[in-house]
């Protein structure tokens, strides 16, 4: 069964929040390159030359798309230069602040839960005066200090009826138990009276964990304590009472006492429990699945010493206001890395991220993980996120872990779950995209999660029971539309900047809670400023390229202004850092000149003598007299020589000097030219009757791009090795074969109905090749760092071709506008 092809391309037309621009960070080399680019080619010649879803239906969509226009060029280069003046030093305070946050990570920073605090407050004093006083008075003080002005308890920034009702009732019960604060109890009961009707209006997806059992249990406790002024018979409660009975009957009583399950997290208020058996399932830290409320209830029922030690420890740690769940160390470490990477700012925190991933790897098990280390219950959400990040960071993790979450052809988050979580399947899909050859369980996970999420999308049901996020539907859509191979780094960052809610994103446990190291405005501010800084630099480079394009008359060879933008966009979307301007501009310029020469060679292919002379002139630089008869030949010959001079000047300096760089660039271009001239007419072009698409290069141009990028990056040894030994390097050969397949697939896609079978076959071949390449790229080995970087360049350029092959033009143009021109 083929992989589900994720490209129906449902273009989003949401209005995006726009913010003011900042300048772009500048590195010395980037400044030099930008000045030359803006100056134009006349300044570049001062140095003397040294000698389940059918792949064929990719572009068919049920919606009518209007072609997006690329945003217009900015005004004057000086305007952009003024905007670019802010140095990277302006970002340093934010970078330092985030770094301090990352280095503070321990067992998880999370907000207090009034509900859990109330359960701990209900624990009577051990060995005291018959239980007439609370064992943990700090929790009572916290309750008194945190009542909201409307009489309720709960999250003050986001109103959820479920959250406010269960928090408020729990706090009223706790205060009533100790006959404290009658006025506060009265205010809480008044709030419950006035808002009970809201429970009937709430969506089921936003119901906290175990609410159907915990809330009725609290109501019964209130009744037992003699709380009179409570609407016990309110109509909104009837369905909750009924659901409680249904859920209690569904709980496998014997199993929950024999093996660890997620039920351990919600024991409070459950009747008829066999505590001696349940104590055998206690977590190693003394808790019941890291739940303060469940553990407090167990402590009241058993007096267990380990339960007491766990509760006592967290009460002291959090000054009375205990969290909804603790610890959450693995959850925090994993999600922090994910947020930093998707926001496009991970490059500032490589050491901290490496420490996070080492921590996660130490606690990884073949059965999976949970939100906390050493958990005896695992879940697919944390497991999938950890698997994906560990694999992307080079750790050797087996996909067989997902067999623990598969049954009867379906995948689940927890054993015995009642509903499927959208984010669980979302993260499973993201993990399944990082697959190697032969990993069938990941194939099954990808098919299942893809179909589940697409169905929810069609139903308008992308809502989750674990998080209230700013734009979860947008996150899901992007992941399905642009899987890992097709997700270019700067496109992902620009998209996620509009989706990340910062401190406003809220998690759903037994109550609403917040993870300040996962969701905060500091990350968002740094990411926005960093993106806008980089974007300003990219706009300067675009202005320089526009001038360079016109001065070299590339329009005479079929290269259009939009092609300039698209070529630069592919480079900037993969190599975006200010310090790598030379590599980025080398990629864009080489792509455009190569396209122009390719067009020219096709145009003169019938004139064998002219073709031979043109190629001969380009590598015999002193023999140019014949060119006077052919103005177009003169234009291209001059443009290429200027480009080689410019690239040699902008390349990272090396010990051998600029002349050696110039020689290597000339050699790479000469070899490419000879291959292009001697190449037979491509049978795919002949069959399709169309010109090749400039964004999807053939293997010769693909290798030329990589060689030029490596030379300009100063990795000369790798570039020389590539030129001399590419036929013997399997990684290079496989990337070239994949490039050919992408080129072929792009041509066939002009008539998907006619070529559906062939496209499907090619897609399978491309998928297998990409899996094999990914395995070689990601797994840690003893390669030199420079070799790994060269592999990364091969991979980045190939991914850009994969993206261009599978993206309709209007979508590419939309991304060009958002990445290059539209500030966040």
From Swiss-Prot:
Q: Answer yes or no on keyword Plastid.
A: yes
| Family listed | Belongs to the terpene synthase family. Tpsc subfamily.
Q: Which intervals of the chain form a coiled coil? A: none
Q: What Gene Ontology terms for biological process does this UniProt record contain? A: diterpenoid biosynthetic process; gibberellin biosynthetic process
Write down the Pfam families for this protein, in alphabetical order. Answer: Terpene_synth (PF01397)
| UniProt remark on domains | The Asp-Xaa-Asp-Asp (DXDD) motif is important for the catalytic activity through binding to Mg(2+).
Annotated motif DXDD motif: location in the chain?
A: 379-382
Q: Which GO terms describe its molecular function?
A: ent-copalyl diphosphate synthase activity; isomerase activity; magnesium ion binding; terpene synthase activity
Segments carrying the region annotation (Disordered) are 1-87
* Catalytic activity from the UniProt record: (2E,6E,10E)-geranylgeranyl diphosphate = ent-copalyl diphosphate
Presequence extent in this chain: 1-63
Location(s) in or outside the cell? Plastid, Chloroplast
InterPro entries per the UniProt record, alphabetical: Isoprenoid_synthase_dom_sf (IPR008949), Terpene_synth_N (IPR001906), Terpene_synth_N_sf (IPR036965), Terpene_synthase-like (IPR050148), Terpenoid_cyclase/PrenylTrfase (IPR008930)
Q: Which UniProt keywords apply?
A: Chloroplast, Isomerase, Magnesium, Metal-binding, Plastid, Transit peptide
Q: Which cofactor does it need?
A: Mg(2+)
Q: What is this protein called?
A: Ent-copalyl diphosphate synthase AN1, chloroplastic
* UniProt keyword annotation of Magnesium present: yes
Inactivation phenotype: Dwarf phenotype due to gibberellin-deficient mutant, displaying reduced internode lengths, foreshortened broad leaves, and unbranched tassel.
Give the EC number(s) under which this enzyme is classified: 5.5.1.13
- Which is a Gene Ontology cellular component entry for this protein? chloroplast
Q: Please give the superkingdom of this protein's source.
A: Eukaryota
Q: Where is the composition biased (Polar residues)?
A: 44-63
